[in-house]
Amino acid sequence: MNIRFVSLAQQEFDNAVEWHQQQSAQLGEQFLDEVHRAIKRIATYPSSCAKIDHDLRRCMVSRFPYGLIYGIDEETIVIVAVAHLHRKPRYWAKRQT
Protein backbone atom coordinates (compact mmCIF):
# COMPACT_ATOMS: atom_id res chain seq x y z
CA MET A 1 0.00 0.00 0.00
CA ASN A 2 1.20 3.51 -0.79
CA ILE A 3 1.62 6.07 1.98
CA ARG A 4 1.00 9.77 1.42
CA PHE A 5 1.16 12.72 3.81
CA VAL A 6 -1.15 15.70 3.25
CA SER A 7 0.94 18.87 3.21
CA LEU A 8 -0.04 20.01 6.73
CA ALA A 9 0.80 16.57 8.14
CA GLN A 10 4.19 16.69 6.41
CA GLN A 11 4.83 20.10 7.97
CA GLU A 12 3.88 18.76 11.41
CA PHE A 13 6.19 15.80 10.94
CA ASP A 14 9.10 17.99 9.79
CA ASN A 15 8.57 20.41 12.70
CA ALA A 16 8.42 17.58 15.24
CA VAL A 17 11.61 16.00 13.89
CA GLU A 18 13.37 19.37 13.97
CA TRP A 19 12.22 20.07 17.55
CA HIS A 20 13.41 16.66 18.80
CA GLN A 21 16.75 17.06 17.00
CA GLN A 22 17.23 20.45 18.65
CA GLN A 23 16.80 18.76 22.03
CA SER A 24 19.44 16.18 21.08
CA ALA A 25 20.52 14.48 17.87
CA GLN A 26 19.90 11.10 19.48
CA LEU A 27 16.35 12.05 20.48
CA GLY A 28 15.66 13.23 16.95
CA GLU A 29 16.83 9.90 15.53
CA GLN A 30 14.76 7.97 18.06
CA PHE A 31 11.65 9.97 17.17
CA LEU A 32 12.24 9.42 13.46
CA ASP A 33 12.72 5.67 14.02
CA GLU A 34 9.51 5.36 16.05
CA VAL A 35 7.47 7.26 13.45
CA HIS A 36 8.87 5.00 10.72
CA ARG A 37 7.91 1.95 12.80
CA ALA A 38 4.38 3.31 13.18
CA ILE A 39 4.16 3.87 9.42
CA LYS A 40 5.29 0.27 8.80
CA ARG A 41 2.59 -0.96 11.22
CA ILE A 42 -0.02 1.05 9.36
CA ALA A 43 1.16 -0.23 5.96
CA THR A 44 1.15 -3.84 7.16
CA TYR A 45 -2.11 -3.74 9.12
CA PRO A 46 -4.03 -0.66 7.94
CA SER A 47 -7.27 -1.52 9.74
CA SER A 48 -5.73 -2.51 13.06
CA CYS A 49 -5.46 0.93 14.67
CA ALA A 50 -8.27 2.56 16.63
CA LYS A 51 -11.01 4.17 14.57
CA ILE A 52 -11.45 7.67 15.96
CA ASP A 53 -13.63 9.58 13.50
CA HIS A 54 -15.70 8.48 10.52
CA ASP A 55 -13.03 6.98 8.27
CA LEU A 56 -9.99 8.08 10.28
CA ARG A 57 -7.77 5.98 12.52
CA ARG A 58 -4.97 6.78 14.96
CA CYS A 59 -1.70 4.89 15.24
CA MET A 60 0.20 5.73 18.39
CA VAL A 61 3.92 6.49 18.10
CA SER A 62 5.75 4.41 20.70
CA ARG A 63 7.69 6.30 23.40
CA PHE A 64 6.47 9.73 22.22
CA PRO A 65 3.17 11.57 22.78
CA TYR A 66 2.25 11.55 19.09
CA GLY A 67 -0.33 9.80 16.98
CA LEU A 68 -0.49 9.40 13.22
CA ILE A 69 -4.03 10.22 12.10
CA TYR A 70 -4.81 8.53 8.80
CA GLY A 71 -7.47 7.40 6.40
CA ILE A 72 -7.48 4.70 3.77
CA ASP A 73 -8.29 5.87 0.25
CA GLU A 74 -8.54 2.86 -2.08
CA GLU A 75 -4.90 1.65 -2.28
CA THR A 76 -3.35 4.63 -0.48
CA ILE A 77 -2.95 5.38 3.20
CA VAL A 78 -3.31 9.13 3.67
CA ILE A 79 -1.75 10.58 6.81
CA VAL A 80 -3.71 13.73 7.65
CA ALA A 81 -1.95 14.67 10.90
CA VAL A 82 1.13 13.97 12.97
CA ALA A 83 -0.64 15.01 16.13
CA HIS A 84 0.92 15.81 19.49
CA LEU A 85 -1.54 14.17 21.84
CA HIS A 86 -1.33 16.83 24.56
CA ARG A 87 -2.24 19.78 22.32
CA LYS A 88 -5.44 20.99 20.67
CA PRO A 89 -7.58 17.86 20.54
CA ARG A 90 -9.12 17.09 17.16
CA TYR A 91 -7.65 20.16 15.42
CA TRP A 92 -7.15 17.93 12.38
CA ALA A 93 -10.81 16.82 12.11
CA LYS A 94 -11.63 18.91 9.03
CA ARG A 95 -8.65 17.78 6.97
CA GLN A 96 -9.48 15.71 3.93
CA THR A 97 -8.01 12.32 3.14
Feature roles, as predicted:
Residues 39-43:
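Short proline/glycine- and basic residue-enriched helix-capping loop/turn segments at helix->loop/beta transitions
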Residues 44-77:
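Basic/aromatic recognition patch in beta-strand/loop cores that engages polyanionic ligands
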Residues 8, 46, 59, 87-89:
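Short linear/disordered segments characteristic of secreted peptide precursors
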Residues 67, 71-97:
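Enriched for short, Lys/Arg-rich terminal
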Residues 1-32:
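Arg/Lys-rich, positively charged N-terminal/basic patches that mediate binding to nucleic acids
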Residues 18, 28-30, 50, 55, ...:
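Solvent-exposed interaction patches of small proteins and small membrane subunits
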